[in-house]
Structures are given as structure tokens and as C-alpha cells.
């Protein structure tokens, strides 16, 4: 690169100094300086998805959109992120615009519902104002809005059935995101917007699918995740879960268009052991010979379900395999697996008290 004139450099430094005095430290910087740090992330609770995102989870200080058809696992993924944030000592806010949050299911996924901040707003404006107030406090690590489609503008709620309200929701989202984007970045909070799919009428070529709430969220989101249910997991005659595929359709912090596949088990959430088996085989850390799965000299079991069960019963083996995979992808290592739901913790506390 050509050398910049010394007088120009001095002028730039003086200008930057004045800007920092006026607007605060970090308001302007050179990209090559140490002040631009690596992007921190919070794990999604799914090893394959953490790898697909490139930085080991969803980026802090950014907006994330999770969208897909009904019952594909969007809220489950958001709740897993909430649980991971709480494990690190973070605070989580949940704007339940759909009025459909199931606390017992959230507890099963590892969410500390006692300390989860929940709001069930009456209007879209109220929901987004509450979200902004929580983010502005600087104490919230993750804010989840479930869902954009349920953020109904006040005019629509107060109006009559059949009234036309074209573009109201899109305008509301555009205005809210303009206000939120800067605050989210400054407070290093992750804003997760869950969104639904709609069909565009009269589309001949390309995908007729679109998300609700206009185009603003597509632009402001640093990460967009397309969640699809691709198969059902059967045990005997009953269905016990879904096979889910996520495509990273937009990623501003790592290469996009990567995919992750995993099991979501009913009342349990993402199957960690199933994910370790799948990724382990893909990375050749777990060997598959016929129907048998093995890790070094350890035989995990015949068939995937038996291998999953072995890892459930032997968490230290699962941890060892997971850390090898994480090391290979330069992701932070796991210290220990503590998978106790708040119900189990409460049960233990009650037992201890009764023993006393």
C-alpha cells in the first residue's frame, strides 16, 4: 500500500481524537487496530449448527432471523440459545407476541425460567418498545421476539375486521430496526427475531415463499437461518421427534450457505448425542463399520440409536469426541457437561431440605 502523507496522517489522528472526545471511545477506529476484536458468540446448543455458523454460535451485538414453516423447530432453537446464554451467566428477555410460550418445555431444554424475563404485549408497538427498553438497559445478553408475524400494529387491533392495513407492519418493523440496530451493537446484545413464511401470489419463477414484516429485517440481520423439518423420527409405531435441516442463508460474520442437520426430540429438544455421532462420523473421529459405531477402541453400539444411548450413559466419552470436533474447527472447548433441567435441580433441593 502507498504511504500516506505525514500531514494527512496527523489530520486524520486529530479528527479521530475529536470524534472520540465528542462521541466516546470506540466510536471511530482503524480496522487494523486491536480495538476491533474477534466477534464473540453464544452457542446454539447444536454442534453442527455452531460449525455451520463459522464462529461457534450466533454473533453478539447482531440481529439474527430464524424463519421457516410451522412446527419446524424455530422456537426450540431460540430457547436453546437462551439456555446457553444463561449457562454463561447472561440475562435473557423473551417477547412472547404469540402468547404461546410453554414454560415446562423451556425448562426441559435447560432454560432457567425463574430468571427468564417474559413479556406478552398487546400490540406490535408495545412489544418492540419493551424489547428496545430491555436492550437499552445494557444488562440483557439475548432478546428473543416470537414472532414477527404476531407483532400486530395498534391500528389493526383497534380497527374492524376486513379493514385494509397494507404496509403497516413493514413500516413498524423498519422504524423499530432503525432504532434498535445501533443499541444492539453498543450493548453487545443478540436480538433474535423468529419469523413465519408466507406465499407470494402469482409467482411463476423462483421461490414463492417470503417472510412477514417487509424487507427491513432481511437487511438488518447479520445471520438468517432457514429451518426445515425433513423427516420424522419413529420409535416403534410412535413418532418421537423430527429430523431438522438448517441452512445459513445469510452470514455477515463467516461464509454463508452452510447447512446443519440434527434431531429434535419431543420434550427434550436438540439431541446432543445424536449430533455428536453424526458430526463425528462426518469428521472421521467416530468410525462406522457396517451398522457398528466405534471411537478408537471403544465400541459405541450397533445402530445409531444404540450409539446415542451409549454416549448418554457415558458423558465423558461424548465430551471427548465433541472437544476433538471443536478443536478441528477452532471452536471453544466444552469444560464439562452439566445437563440438569431446573426441575431436576428443584427436586434435588427439595430432597436435601427434607433430609435436613
From Swiss-Prot:
Its main location: cytoplasm. It comes from Clostridium botulinum (strain Alaska E43 / Type E3). This is Protein RecA. GO terms for biological process: DNA recombination; DNA repair; SOS response. Pfam families: RecA, RecA_C. Can catalyze the hydrolysis of ATP in the presence of single-stranded DNA, the ATP-dependent uptake of single-stranded DNA by duplex DNA, and the ATP-dependent hybridization of homologous single-stranded DNAs. It interacts with LexA causing its activation and leading to its autocatalytic cleavage. ATP binds at residues 68-75. One of its GO terms (molecular function) is ATP-dependent DNA damage sensor activity. PANTHER family: MITOCHONDRIAL DNA REPAIR PROTEIN RECA HOMOLOG-RELATED (PTHR45900:SF1), RECA (PTHR45900). GO terms for cellular component: cytosol. Belongs to the RecA family. It is found in: Cytoplasm. Gene3D superfamilies: P-loop containing nucleotide triphosphate hydrolases. It comes from the Bacteria. Keywords: ATP-binding, Cytoplasm, DNA damage, DNA recombination, DNA repair, DNA-binding, Nucleotide-binding, SOS response.
Amino acid at each position: 500500500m502507498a504511504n500516506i502523507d505525514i500531514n494527512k496522517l496527523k489530520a486524520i489522528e486529530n479528527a479521530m481524537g475529536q470524534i472520540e472526545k465528542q462521541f466516546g471511545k470506540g466510536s471511530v477506529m482503524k480496522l487494523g487496530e486491536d480495538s476491533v476484536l474477534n466477534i464473540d458468540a453464544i452457542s446454539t446448543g447444536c454442534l453442527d449448527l455452531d460449525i455451520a455458523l463459522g464462529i461457534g454460535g450466533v454473533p453478539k451485538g447482531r440481529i439474527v432471523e430464524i424463519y421457516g414453516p410451522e412446527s419446524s423447530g424455530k422456537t426450540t432453537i431460540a430457547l436453546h440459545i437462551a439456555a446457553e446464554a444463561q449457562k454463561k451467566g447472561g440475562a435473557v428477555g423473551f417477547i412472547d407476541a404469540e402468547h404461546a410460550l410453554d414454560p415446562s418445555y423451556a425448562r426441559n431444554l435447560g432454560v432457567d425460567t425463574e430468571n427468564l424475563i417474559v413479556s406478552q404485549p398487546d400490540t406490535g408497538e408495545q412489544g418492540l418498545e419493551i424489547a428496545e427498553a430491555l436492550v437499552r438497559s445494557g444488562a440483557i445478553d439475548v432478546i428473543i421476539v416470537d414472532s414477527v408475524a404476531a407483532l400486530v400494529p395498534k391500528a389493526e387491533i383497534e380497527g374492524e375486521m376486513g379493514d385494509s392495513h397494507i404496509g403497516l407492519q413493514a413500516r413498524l418493523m423498519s422504524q423499530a430496526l432503525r432504532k434498535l440496530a445501533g443499541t444492539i451493537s453498543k450493548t453487545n446484545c443478540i436480538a433474535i427475531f423468529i419469523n413465519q413464511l408466507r406465499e407470494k401470489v402469482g409467482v411463476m419463477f423462483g421461490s414463492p415463499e417470503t417472510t412477514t414484516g417487509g424487507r427491513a429485517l432481511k437487511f438488518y440481520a447479520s445471520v438468517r437461518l432457514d429451518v426445515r423439518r425433513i423427516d420424522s423420527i419413529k420409535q416403534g409405531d410412535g413418532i418421537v421427534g423430527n429430523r431438522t435441516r438448517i441452512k445459513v442463508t445469510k452470514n455477515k460474520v463467516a461464509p454463508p450457505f452452510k447447512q446443519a442437520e440434527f434431531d429434535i426430540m419431543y420434550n427434550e429438544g436438540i439431541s446432543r448425542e445424536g449430533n455428536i455421532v453424526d458430526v463425528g462420523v462426518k469428521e472421521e473421529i467416530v468410525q462406522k463399520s457396517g451398522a457398528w459405531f466405534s471411537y478408537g477402541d471403544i465400541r459405541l453400539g450397533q445402530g445409531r440409536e444404540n450409539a446415542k444411548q451409549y454416549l448418554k450413559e457415558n458423558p465423558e466419552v461424548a465430551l471427548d469426541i465433541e472437544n476433538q470436533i471443536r478443536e478441528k474447527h477452532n471452536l471453544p472447548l466444552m469444560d464439562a457437561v452439566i445437563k440438569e433441567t431446573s426441575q431436576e435441580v428443584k427436586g434435588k433441593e427439595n430432597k436435601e431440605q427434607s433430609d435436613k
